[in-house]
Each structure stands twice: as C-alpha cells, then as structure tokens.
C-alpha cells in the first residue's frame, strides 16, 4: 500500500531546456547551480514531505496553490510552481525579441504596445518591496494584467493564468548583480522564449 500511495504524485524538478551555463552572463551557471539546483530542489523536497498523509497528497501543484491555506504547504507549492514557470520561460537564443501572434495582439489590446507593457512589468518588479514575484497573467475574462505577488504566491490564487514571471527574491540575482535588481530585470528581457509564454495562454 505504501508503494502504491507513493506513486500517486511526487513532485520533481523541471528539466532545464538549456545547459546550466547557457544563459550566462545574464544568469550565470553559479546562479543556476544555487537557484535551480539548491533553492528549487529544497522546495521540491519540502513539498513532497509536507503533503504526505494530507488531503493535498495526489494533487497537482496548481491545485495546491489555488486552495491551500497560508502556511508551509502553500509556500513550498507556490515556489515549486513559480520556479518551474520561471526556468522554463528562458532560452539562450530567442527566435524573436518580443511576442508575436495572439500574445502580441493581447499585449497591444491591454497595454497599448510592447514597450508600455515592458515598462509596467519592469516597474512592478522593481517596486515590489522585499521578496516576491511580478507576473504577467491572464484574468478570467482573458485580459492581460500585471500582478505583484509577495513571497511564494502566484496569480493562480486569484483565479488567473500565470504567463511570465520575474523572481525578485535576492537569491535570483545577488550572485550576478548584487543589489542591482534593475540591471538584472533589464537583462531578463533578452532571454525570454516568447513562444513558451504564448503557449501558457
């Protein structure tokens, strides 16, 4: 019985679609080793241990984040989800430097143009006090919005779809940029895989 239960759902690390040094110098291999290899691995390990024997066992990370009460299970599930979306949205050689297709049309509709969106997203991430995330999300009506989430929270908690996330916890950038959060954010725009972001709509 124990073996069967353990097969229901275990949370695992996302496979990076690039080599650990491929995003350098924007995100160094050292940062990937710590941020992905240690921080995210810890959240994954914690979540697997915490949900065992609870009503959340066997639920997807998205399901947990949507309904779990504030506390350790929610915090770790949120960070597993956030970091999975984060690491999978990058590519060392983007085919395009801004969105195309339906994502581009939605940005045009809801922000006026790409530069306005970029400025608003950067401002949200820059101005978030302490640790947290800035997200481009799609609300229940299909409108694109920028959401600031504290700590490990995610727009799923508000019934939205997360499309693009910027991590402003210091562990995301301190090895490469020290206290220069703004420089880090400016560089992230150069490695976004817009096709991945669009496919999340």
Give the positions of each predicted feature:
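Short, Lys/Arg-enriched N-terminal segments with co-localized hydrophobic residues
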Residues: 1-8
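Feature for soluble, non-membrane regions of globular proteins
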Residues: 8-201
């Amino acid at each position: 019985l124990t073996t069967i239960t353990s097969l229901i759902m275990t949370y695992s690390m996302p496979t990076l679609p690039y080599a650990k040094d491929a995003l350098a110098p924007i995100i160094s291999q050292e940062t990937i080793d710590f941020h992905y290899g240690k921080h995210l691995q810890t959240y994954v390990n914690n979540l697997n241990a915490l949900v065992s024997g609870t009503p959340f066992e066997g639920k997807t990370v998205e399901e947990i984040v949507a309904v779990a009460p504030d506390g350790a299970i929610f915090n770790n599930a949120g960070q597993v989800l956030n970091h999975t979306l984060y690491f999978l949205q990058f590519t060392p050689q983007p085919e395009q430097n801004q969105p195309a297709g339906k994502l581009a049309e939605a940005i045009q509709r809801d922000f006026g143009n790409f530069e306005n969106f970029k400025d608003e997203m950067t401002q949200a991430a820059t101005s978030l006090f302490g640790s947290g995330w800035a997200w481009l999300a799609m609300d229940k009506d299909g409108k694109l919005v920028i959401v600031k989430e504290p700590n490990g929270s995610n727009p799923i908690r508000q019934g939205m779809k997360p499309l693009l996330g910027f991590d402003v916890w210091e562990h995301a950038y301190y090895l490469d940029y020290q206290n220069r959060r703004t420089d880090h954010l400016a560089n992230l725009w150069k490695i976004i895989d817009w096709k991945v972001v669009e496919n999340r709509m």
